[in-house]
Amino acid sequence: MSSLKGHPKGLYLIFATSTAERFSYYGMRAIFILFLTQALLFDKEAAASIYGSYTGLVYLTPLIGGYIADKYWGIRRSVFWGAVMMAVGQFLMFMSASSLNNTDLAHWLMYGGLGFMILGNGCFKPTVSSLVGQLYEPGDKRLDAAYTIFYMGVNVGSFAAPLICGFLGDTGNPQDFKWGFLASGIMTLFTVVLFETQKNKYLFSPSGEPIGIVPDARREKKEDKAEHISHPKMDKRTKVRNIIIITALTVALIAFFSYAFSDDWISVGIFTACIVFPVLILLDGSLTKVE
């Protein structure tokens, strides 16, 4: 397998992909609160609520995104579609900042952009780092250094983004925020193009097998089947029972948190999802004891 300075070349593809994605994320965040208060003219309390809800959901959705990648999509598909959704979100933010003369449109574009970025981050964030470990044999002494290199990319993107996007967007003129969002959008688009065009060239296991295509759970079950290890299955009655449990739990939590938080529907959604998502995953009868 091709290598560079003692590491698989796939590591440097993951490094570049993560650097670009973290640039787009932290670049947008660096100017977002200023955009809300100076361009969209939200008061500080409302702006802080939107910003806090966005960042909270960004850290919540990887829970379900990782589950989907592990069970259904596989890592490559999750990374690709996560980056695509984030790119759409960043360009919607650019369009929002370009539509300040139409306040309602600017608000809707902003909320749409946040939604796409939240969903995209949920798919991308928990999966891209897991590719690193699959490039090496278990117990490989280079693995610690590989993760150090990977997180160097994360830190480089996180450090450079506020400087560049802040310089472009925070000029004192509300019309200029769009340039900061555009820079973030371009970097996210670069993430999509880079990963999609290079993944088949560099992402291979030490044995030469492509990594990240088959969902981990499906691959592990095939291996266990070959070794005659059985896994539990859900029958239709169990599936119906689980649907009823999740529905009843969701309705009950929404009612409770609606009473507790009054009209703050974003907090209601976050707190409800924090409980429902783990329960949904735990009710999956196909989970193994290890999972």
For each feature predicted by the language model, list its residue ranges:
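Intracellular loop-helix junctions on the cytosolic face of multi-pass helical membrane proteins
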Residues: 1-9, 138, 166-291
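Cytosolic juxtamembrane N-terminal segment immediately preceding the first transmembrane helix
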Residues: 1-25, 101-108
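Hydrophobic core of transmembrane alpha-helices in multi-pass small-molecule transporters
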Residues: 19, 89, 103-124
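A gly/Pro-rich, aromatic-decorated transmembrane alpha-helix motif that marks the paired
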Residues: 29-30, 63-64, 156-171
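Short amphipathic helix-loop junctions that connect adjacent transmembrane helices
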Residues: 30-50, 170
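Interfacial helix-cap and linker-helix signal at transmembrane-aqueous boundaries
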Residues: 36-37, 68-72, 100, 164-174
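Central cavity-lining transmembrane alpha-helices of secondary-active solute carriers
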Residues: 52-71, 87, 125, 159-161
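C-terminal ends and interior cores of transmembrane alpha-helices
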Residues: 81-105
